[in-house]
Amino acid sequence: EGIIYTDVLVEVLFADDNDANLTNGTPNDIAIIQAFALHGITLLSNAVIAHSPISIAPANIDINISANISATYSWALSSANCFYRVNDNTNWNTLSMTANGNNYTATIPAQPNGNIVAYYISLTDNYGFESGINPQESNVIPIKDANLPFFVMVGYELYEEEDFDFNVGFWQTGHPSDIATTGMWEIGSPIGSYDDPSTLSGMVQPAYQHTPNGYACAFTQNASSINDGIGANDVDGGHTTLFSPYYNLTNYTNPAFTYWRWYTNNPSSGANPGADWWQVMITDDGVNWEYVENTL
């Protein structure tokens, strides 16, 4: 997927065309489009959705979502949509985004205090194929296999923030039950890991963390340099564990946690893609744990 493959698709359509006008279709356009779509290539594969995520919103006020959408083949853009769901609902609601030039907007209905709204943006081309998902792959079904969407916390106030830079917190890396031989959790400055270090493409471990102007995060072991192979210090041999501090939430109503994470399990040059999994769990007594995320 990307600009090169999309250009190849367009060249094939031009070769099939009989009136030098792709906007009105070609004799075999449906078969061509469907064949390329089987490989994840659409007319909008190189579209760019510029969007500033909404993370906090006041209660009982509509939540306005806006994005700037640009595409090389803008004539192929049929619609832009915002999908959202509330709390534990697994069904997505669809909002058609209104266009004003390259700017698109949608309004998520007002929500009461304590609700958490998940949402993502996607594009549909003239042939009905979805593309340009933002965040990428957040539309995958079942939800456990999907990337995280954007989340809006309605009516919440920030109580504690731990970013490993300005407030580290009492995090614990590792547990006696861990059996991983490489890729153990560390806290520090990450070194990027790439399928192709010469072009910095195919990123497996980011070379940066999320906090603006920060440098540190928790990660599963650095390689010696970005020139090492992606398997140099990946997680091998078993699991590794990272524990947050304990938080006393006795005096709080409907508390919520947020976190930023990067996880990949299918690099194109990986030795065994798709064989590992990611799990996040939470407990209120230190004994009984519930899954927050589980890709197994």
For each predicted feature, which ranges?
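Terminal beta-strand-rich extracellular "head" domains
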Residues: 286-296
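Glycan-association/targeting regions that enable binding to alpha-glucans and other polysaccharides
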Residues: 30-183, 245, 265
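Extended, low-complexity, turn-rich repeat/linker tracts enriched in Gly/Pro/Ser/Thr and Asp/Glu
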Residues: 249-253, 262-274
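Short coil-to-beta strand junction motifs in C2/discoidin
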Residues: 77, 270-279
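Short beta-strands within extracellular/lumenal beta-sheet-rich domains
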Residues: 228-252
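Extracellular low-complexity, Gly/Ser/Thr-rich intrinsically disordered linkers
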Residues: 1-44, 116, 217, 225-228, ...
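Extracellular glycan-recognition surfaces and repeat-rich motifs
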Residues: 157-231, 273-275, 294-296
